[in-house]
Each structure stands twice: as structure tokens, then as C-alpha cells.
Amino acid sequence: MMATSPMESLSSGFIINIELFFITLLLALPLGLVIRFCSMSKFKPLKWLSRTFVWIIRGTPLMLQLFVVLYAPGLLFSMPMNSRFTAAVIAFVINYAAYFSEIYRGGIESVSKGQYEAGQVLGMTKTQIFFKIILLQVIKRIIPPLSNEVITLTKDTSLARIIGLAEIIMCAERFTKQGLIWPLFSTAVFFLVFNGILTILFGWIEKKMDYFRV
């Protein structure tokens, strides 16, 4: 069996980071909105449950959450987590959904109550007011903090290596121990280029929404 070359190994690790990044975004963005709505609920048990969830997740390290998701099912319920990638996805989605919910909160609360009252005067339901009047304003307001959180996510994907997931930094480290330094620099280039693309993308989105004054 031929040994894997550094470039093949880094490419494999790169794919892990990218998959973890996009799956986390795909699931955490809508879940964060659900958590935000639950926190605004008039049903107090649901309201306090969601707020307690956010408090716990934001108050504990992502690294700890990765270990809990990987080992807790087996230790508590004799149902071991067989896939380390799945464990990483669950931990990342839970963590980032909590942070996204707080970003949504800031955006929603920044919209004046007069906007809601104007919608009510026009005979709109609360759902119609949110999607037709509030949503675009919220999106414009949350783009800067959301972009920061998304860029942080790209770097946080490297934490998956602590549960044995062979992401790009773990792959680079293996070859560094063999006396090669360039895989580390290649890894740095990956993060710089990827985050550079995201920065350009979010900048483009902000410019596209400049017409919408809030």
C-alpha cells in the first residue's frame, strides 16, 4: 500500500473542513432563528428553556461540547457515537445556532416598534409584518456580525481534530513531525484564501443592500 503524499493528505483534510463548514451553516442558520423565536415566545417554559440553552452553550468551550457529543451518548445511554464527523457536525451546529440566535436577537430588537405598529395598522398579521417589513431590515443589520461569526467558523473547524477527525491541520501536523514545514504554510494559505473569499462575498452582499436604508 502506497503512502499518502502530503498534498493528497492536505486535500483530504481540506474536504473535511469544507464539509463541516457548509453543513454547519446550512443547519445552524435556520436553527438559530428557531431558537430566537422560542426565546421570544409568550409560553414561559419554552422561553426559559431556549434562553438557558443559549446561556449554557455560549458559556462553555466548543472543545468541551465536542467531547460531550462524542462520549456522552455511550457513557449515559450505552449508545456510542460511531461517527466522529457526525459528532463534530452536531457539536458545531448546536454551538453556532446559539451564537446565531443572539445575532438575530440584536437585529430584531434594533428595529423600532413603530414598524410593527405600522404593519398592524395596515391589517397585517405578525407573520406578514415580520416577512414583509422586518426581515430585510434585520438581514441588513446582522450582516457585519454574521460575517465575523462565519469567518470564525472556518477557523473553528480545525478544533475537530481534538476528537480524531483528520481535518487539514491534523494532516499538516503529521508531516511536520516527519520534518516537513511547508504543509503548515499550505494550511495557512488555505484559511487565508477561504476567508478572503468570504470577506469579498459579504462585502458584495452589503453593497447590494445599500439601497435598503434602515
Predicted regions and their residues:
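Transmembrane alpha-helices and adjacent helix-loop boundaries
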Residues: 1-214
